[in-house]
């Protein structure tokens, strides 16, 4: 994740440095990236909530089981124990459904992440293409500077020659 952030930062720095505008591709990428990050956070929150439900339910069931021994009336104890088993069965079914729904999030997030990466890499390819035109501009500037320097050298050589005469 740190590498992904670093890579993203590199593209951002390049964009600012080069005044590069990725146009619609960049807009779509940024929107999709934001949606992915929000979806990823929401999925993590769902997992946290399911874990909390399990933790609370475990504590409640432990307490219920412990308190069964406190009954003095065997009939009430049997009825409560039966209700405990029934409730645990229904709870297990509920948790199974929640975990099944949770498991379906991962492939969807993976597909969304793949799309985000694909758009990003296409954006990077386009940005690298922009580097070529920047390189050509720098190369022209360098050639012009070299020509001006050669001209200045010729002029200074001519001046030095005229001083010797």
Regions found by a protein language model. Give the residues of each.
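N-terminal Sec/ER secretory leader and immediately downstream segment
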Residues: 1-48
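Amphipathic alpha-helical coiled-coil segments
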Residues: 3, 38-50, 86-104, 141-153
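A structural signal for long alpha-helical coiled-coils and helix-turn connectors
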Residues: 11, 15-18, 65-68, 72, ...
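Short, charged, amphipathic alpha-helical segments
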Residues: 26-34, 77-85, 129-136
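Extended amphipathic alpha-helical interaction segments
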Residues: 49-129
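Long amphipathic all-alpha helical oligomerization modules
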Residues: 99-165
């Amino acid at each position: 994740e740190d590498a992904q952030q670093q890579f993203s930062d590199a593209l951002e720095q390049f964009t600012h440095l080069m005044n590069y505008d990725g146009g619609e591709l960049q807009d779509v990428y940024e929107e999709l990236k934001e949606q992915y990050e929000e979806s990823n956070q929401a999925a993590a929150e769902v997992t946290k909530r399911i874990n909390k439900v399990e933790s609370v339910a475990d504590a409640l069931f432990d307490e219920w089981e412990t308190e069964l021994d406190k009954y003095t009336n065997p009939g009430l104890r049997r009825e409560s124990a039966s209700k405990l088993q029934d409730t645990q069965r229904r709870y297990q079914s509920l948790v199974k459904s929640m975990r099944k729904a949770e498991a379906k999030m991962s492939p969807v997030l993976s597909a969304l992440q793949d799309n985000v990466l694909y758009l990003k890499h296409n954006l990077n390819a386009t940005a690298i293409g922009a580097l070529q035109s920047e390189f050509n501009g720098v190369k022209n500037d360098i050639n012009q500077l070299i020509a001006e320097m050669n001209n200045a050298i010729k002029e200074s050589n001519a001046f030095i020659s005229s001083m010797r005469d």
